[in-house]
């Protein structure tokens, strides 16, 4: 009777260790992903934003991969997998886009920083 009890205990411990290792791997992969974003804004209010297709064309011609191109308010956001890709894209777009645009690089290192950025971007009115 003691042999099955030991096997059940060992099975429970190995299951717990396996669950812990799986959880740690998931947490590590989530922390390791560091996206980077380029924000393109017009300097003057009347200037139109470049369309996403022209941005895609410039980046593709230089072999720079990106995750997404999204318009938001009066800004065009381009998301990359790494800050190196974002820096290369910034250099390309600085050369190829006409003057009159601000191209800013934003590294999204953590979920907490993304939430703080969202809170800072929204205007809050009390009273």
From Swiss-Prot:
<comment type="similarity">
    <text>Belongs to the MzrA family.</text>
</comment>
<feature type="topological domain" description="Cytoplasmic">
    <location>
        <begin position="1"/>
        <end position="10"/>
    </location>
</feature>
<dbReference type="InterPro" id="IPR026574">
    <property type="entry name" value="Modulator_MzrA"/>
</dbReference>
<comment type="function">
    <text>Modulates the activity of the EnvZ/OmpR two-component regulatory system, probably by directly modulating EnvZ enzymatic activity and increasing stability of phosphorylated OmpR. Links the two-component systems CpxA/CpxR and EnvZ/OmpR.</text>
</comment>
<keyword id="KW-0997">Cell inner membrane</keyword>
<dbReference type="InterPro" id="IPR027398">
    <property type="entry name" value="SecD-TM"/>
</dbReference>
<keyword id="KW-1003">Cell membrane</keyword>
<feature type="topological domain" description="Periplasmic">
    <location>
        <begin position="32"/>
        <end position="127"/>
    </location>
</feature>
<dbReference type="GO" id="GO:0016020">
    <property type="term" value="C:membrane"/>
</dbReference>
<dbReference type="GO" id="GO:0005886">
    <property type="term" value="C:plasma membrane"/>
</dbReference>
<keyword id="KW-0812">Transmembrane</keyword>
<comment type="subunit">
    <text>Interacts with EnvZ.</text>
</comment>
<dbReference type="Pfam" id="PF13721">
    <property type="entry name" value="SecD-TM1"/>
</dbReference>
<keyword id="KW-1133">Transmembrane helix</keyword>
<protein>
    <recommendedName>
        <fullName>Modulator protein MzrA</fullName>
    </recommendedName>
</protein>
<keyword id="KW-0472">Membrane</keyword>
<dbReference type="GO" id="GO:0019901">
    <property type="term" value="F:protein kinase binding"/>
</dbReference>
<feature type="transmembrane region" description="Helical">
    <location>
        <begin position="11"/>
        <end position="31"/>
    </location>
</feature>
